[in-house]
Amino acid sequence: MNKVKFPLKLLTLALVSQFSFSSLAYATTPHPQADKLDLVWKVVDHDIGENIFLGSLTITNNGTEALSDQGWSLYFNSVRPPASVLPDSDPNGVNARQQLASQHVSIRNADVAKSGDYFVLEPTKGFTPIYPGESREIMITAQYWQMLKNDSPSGFHISFNGTAPQAVMVDVFMDPSNPKHTRQSIHDIKPVETAALRFAENTSTKQAISIKNQVVPQLQSVEPTDGAFLNLLGWLATINAPDNLRNEALYLQSALKDLIQGDFQINTANQYPAQQITLKLNPNLDTDGDGSADNEGYKLTIDPFNGITIEGKDEAGVFYGIQTLRQLIPSDVYKNSTTAYKEKNAVLSAFSAKDAPRFEYRGMMLDVSRNFQSKETIFKLIDLLAYYKINKFELNVANDEGWRLEIPGIPELTEFGAKRGYDLEEKQMLHTFMGASNGFAVGDGIQGKPENVTVANKGVPPKYQGFEVAQQNFLGEGWGYYTVQDFKEILKYAADRHIDIILEYDFPAHARAAIKAMEYRYNKYKDTDPVEANRYRLIDPLNESRYYTPQFYTDNMVNPALESTFTFLEKVISETKKMYDSVPEAQVTRLHGGGDELPHLGPNEWWAKSPLVQQNPVTAGKSDAELFDYFFTRWASIIRQNGFQVASWGDVLTHNGTGNANYGELFPLFWNNVWGWGNEHQSYVFANKGYKVVLSHATNLYFDLAYTKHPDEVGYHWAGYTDTKKAFEYRPFNIYANGKTDKLGNPVAWNPDWVHLTEEGKKNVVGLQGQLFGENLKSPEIMEYLTFPKLLGVAERAWVTDMPIEDAPDATGKTSMDRAWDTFSNTLGQYALDKLEYIQVVDIYNQVPNTHGVNYRVPLPGAVIEQGKLKINNRFPGLTTQYSLDDGQTWIPYYGPVDVSHAAKVQVRSVTASGRSSRTEYIPQ
């Protein structure tokens, strides 16, 4: 559910050994003209009309031969499509084509299907060759707007006279200080983030943090033992656990051995050594004193004489007690665990705590269809989710841009649907999307910010901390899928950490990868076995209904009139169920059927002009909305009959169908609360009607939205910008209080028609889910950057029962939520981020490569110079801030205002415990 409406040498196209390209030609040596081309994309002006902006592409010829006036085609992807592909009925399209014609070039859809974000620029009659040493700037009108560098065209590759294409690298330029580059429209009053703006917003100051708040999510209640400590000795401590907590004991043993020298032997025979960690169950455990047992609750006791006891209401409760214990181990122990100076002990404060979650559903969704993530990357993320007590992990494995799970009996889904490349007719694979297409050799990708590589960094390797030009140059995994065995291992790995895996197969829209794969299958069998060819076919090729999705597709919806559509879906779900059944530890809970982002009816038609719809007596005469009802009723039934509960996006209930269908029991996830779009209250409407709702609101819970408005940030911005504070401040039972400003910075107007939750409706809100869609997840580093520390804010809201009350500001100008943020930001700055810097995957069965640390976003500091004095603060008090007066050659820790009146240049940055730094920023005098 991701709206998207809204540098440099040529390198060789390389073959990828594990796949065959039998009918496609690929270059093995660079073209002598092409290998000297450089490209630069610039934003020029947003103030040229509604929903369009002006950009430019500069082609520089550094070679010895001219780039001729004909015979070449420059291909690229763009999430901001050229306006020239708009129809004649749209004046913007007419004007854009005239603009290009005056420059003697054209831009059109590149692929035969004219579907998606793939385009080609070609010279037309009158084009003047670009001679050696010359540059040519081509002005291009594009749709919507570009606020961030990663909105730029990407994945450029050039073909000469129909020969195999080769990658051409592009650089990107945007000026953060130029409103023409960063102001979406005249209505956009949201400023670009600056050091001065951050300085004003960073109102939290460093404060002491109690044990209750040293953990994320914070503990429900704590009874400290004043001044008492337990010295946990690795050589002495053992783990005492019954057989039914063997999994939890193994996990704890592995986690402690990662941090502290020692064996931490597991003792299940009830022998009591001198120092013990005891795990036990108490099915009657009541953590909040209301007289009833609390699912997933636990009691953690650290006693200087009796050791550590973790008592859980259930196995999950014991496991979450272990996570709390892990987080309470001092940061220095984490730091030294990755060195030759690994600690032999850990000193822990003595106390007793009780804890239990607010919501039963605490989730995260990861889209692996747009950019594939390896099994090992998934393992690491699952372990991190467990660390913060997340218990649901949704994997979007099937979408327009890729099918990522092997389905026995339908090998074409991954033979074709898990590959992207240069295939204009899509005979062997999907065409390239979003600049991620395997086959193009592009060097070594993410490099880290070069300005952070100085002597002062003491050799610490740079890590991704914002836009790098590699993102636009074939970074990303267009190819890849999980085998059945891979997925079984993922299920087991997650189950061992008390996380349920929820697969998402998105239908009837967002199904392009499946559709094209089944057309590939159809063509494979049509001449030899027509029955087999049609067995899983998903479309009516004669359907003349026309639609255009938010992601620019014209062919991504399966047809409900074909019985083969439902044969296909039944096969997919039955094979999926077999995978779950083969892993005894895995819970068979929900399966997500999608149902989102069908283009709005009126300007679009879905199936009304399909001959097969009219020929089928079951579907003949039905409207598109009625056909959707018919489809989703059967789709939900297939999921349910295979033993899964049916999850869907809220679109299924809000606008796709007639509103009169009975889909059976649904568990909807509502994403569309974008301020001003008119759907802000829909989650409450359906919770009040009795649906078990998972809140997934884009404005606060979409991790793939950029942290803030600045061209160097990564992500999207169609619903605004989302940082850790915005996730933390999310109010599940009063979402309207979340809406201070809209995505353009304008105050949100109160709507008296907004529906509020009833008391019964509150009971039907079963949890929260953070979403991470994959368009920009072109490396694991980027994935971690967008997820952390946003995830910590969502974890806090999903677990902690006590929300800050909504009250007026106090004498200091702060509300209860402000004060809660002050505490939480200190928790991150003083405790949580230090541990994320060094955390190791708890790898019980040696499944994950030896790795440690998380590439979380390091916040840029706030800074101003007032009367010659430099003042710096930080979003997370406790993080080190530094300044440089010699253009980054040396960095000085900041302790208080410092005279910089003599300095020609002043730079600031934040630095982590390991020496990683944020992006640097110059502060104007």
Question: Where in the sequence are the language-model features?
Answer:
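Low-complexity, acidic Ser/Thr/Pro/Gly-rich terminal tails and inter-domain linkers that flank the onset
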Residues: 28-51
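Terminal connector regions
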Residues: 52, 108-118, 127-190
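Asparagine-centered strand-capping/turn motif at beta-strand->loop junctions
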Residues: 58-66
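Acidic, contiguous N-terminal accessory segments
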Residues: 152, 158-335, 339-357, 647-654, ...
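Short, compositionally stereotyped local motifs that mark structural "simplifiers"
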Residues: 238, 819-925
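Feature activates predominantly on carbohydrate-active enzymes
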Residues: 291, 295, 303-555, 564, ...
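Active-site neighborhood of glycoside hydrolase catalytic domains
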Residues: 549-665, 673, 677-678
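Flexible, acidic glycine-rich loops studded with aromatic residues
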Residues: 645-868
